[in-house]
């Protein structure tokens, strides 16, 4: 077994002003997405400066949707007892699935403003999202969040405050799968023009498969436990409609046009 790295969650402290690693990871993800998005802006048919506007929409969607999603999916009883708890962002967490819904709403608003097809925009955004997912999982790891289940694998970590047993470093698994692998696959697939909706469908399907798999070694949320069959978690349940939507999008995309503003400009 390995000892959990002793990393101070506070990256920078200047008097009462503190910057946490978790917050910095969000910044890293957004800045990385902004930089790569500007490099591919011509594919979307917008000016590079518009990517900053897209980032603003996306950031609002992630933060608002992530918090609302966490409250509804993982803390509904507490929300019902104290509706103002949803504003206590330091107490609780963020939900990827809620953040995804928030980003989709933000994408719809941005697409309307810039007169873009909705799935044309989501295909552009999908390869950028793993940067934020991977950075966020590193933030979870530094904060000792999302511990794995007890195991005896050689790389098991002893989590602070959870007893002497070794546990799966589940945030690192998710970093590798949802961050690194998804980015490489989506970036490579999207390097050539694809039919509208195909990249979005592949994103949903990959995330659903990876998240469903990692949930088997990740400790269930204490306030929920297993929600069915003595093994199904809320995270797994929420990935099922994602997988179905991903498959449906990939099938639907076969009848859609190829999206690339550079090709359209040349015709």
Curated annotation (Swiss-Prot):
Keyword set includes Nucleotide-binding: no
Protein's cellular compartments: Cell inner membrane
Catalytic EC class: transferase
Residues reported in the UniProt entry to bind a 1,2-diacyl-sn-glycero-3-phospho-(1'-sn-glycerol): 137
Entry GO terms, CC: plasma membrane
GO molecular function: phosphatidylglycerol-prolipoprotein diacylglyceryl transferase activity
Main location: membrane
Membrane topology: Multi-pass membrane protein
Residues spanning the membrane: 10-30, 54-74, 90-110, 116-136, 169-189, 197-217, 231-251
EC number(s) given by UniProt: 2.5.1.145
Superkingdom in the source lineage: Bacteria
Keyword annotations from UniProtKB, A to Z: Cell inner membrane, Cell membrane, Membrane, Transferase, Transmembrane, Transmembrane helix
A GO BP annotation: lipoprotein biosynthetic process
Pfam families according to UniProt: LGT
Metabolic or biological pathway: Protein modification; lipoprotein biosynthesis (diacylglyceryl transfer)
HAMAP family: Lgt
Family note: Belongs to the Lgt family.
Role played: Catalyzes the transfer of the diacylglyceryl group from phosphatidylglycerol to the sulfhydryl group of the N-terminal cysteine of a prolipoprotein, the first step in the formation of mature lipoproteins.
Protein's name according to its UniProt entry: Phosphatidylglycerol--prolipoprotein diacylglyceryl transferase
Biological source species: Chromohalobacter salexigens (strain ATCC BAA-138 / DSM 3043 / CIP 106854 / NCIMB 13768 / 1H11)
């Amino acid at each position: 077994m390995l000892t959990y790295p002793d990393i101070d969650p506070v990256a920078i402290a200047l008097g009462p002003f503190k910057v946490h690693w978790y917050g910095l990871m969000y910044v890293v993800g957004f800045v990385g997405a902004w930089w790569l998005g500007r490099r591919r802006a011509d594919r979307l048919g917008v000016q590079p400066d518009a990517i900053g506007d897209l980032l603003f929409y996306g950031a609002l969607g992630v933060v608002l949707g992530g918090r609302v999603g966490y409250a509804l999916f993982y803390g509904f009883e507490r929300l019902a007892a104290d509706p103002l708890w949803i504003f206590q962002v330091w107490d609780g967490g963020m939900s990827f699935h809620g953040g995804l819904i928030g980003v989709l709403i933000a994408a719809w608003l941005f697409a309307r403003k810039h007169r873009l097809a909705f799935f044309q925009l989501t295909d552009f955004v999908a390869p950028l999202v793993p940067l934020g997912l991977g950075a966020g999982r590193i933030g979870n790891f530094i904060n000792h969040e999302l511990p794995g289940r007890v195991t005896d694998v050689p790389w098991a970590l002893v989590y602070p405050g959870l007893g002497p047993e070794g546990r799966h470093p589940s945030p690192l698994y998710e970093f590798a799968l949802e961050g690194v692998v998804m980015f490489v696959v989506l970036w490579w697939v999207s390097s050539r023009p694809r039919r509208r909706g195909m990249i979005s469908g592949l994103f949903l399907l990959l995330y659903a498969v990876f998240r469903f798999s990692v949930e088997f070694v990740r400790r269930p949320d204490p306030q929920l436990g297993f929600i069915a069959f003595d093994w199904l978690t809320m995270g797994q349940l929420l990935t099922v409609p994602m997988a179905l939507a991903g498959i449906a999008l990939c099938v639907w995309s076969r009848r859609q046009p190829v999206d690339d503003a550079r090709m359209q400009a040349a015709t």
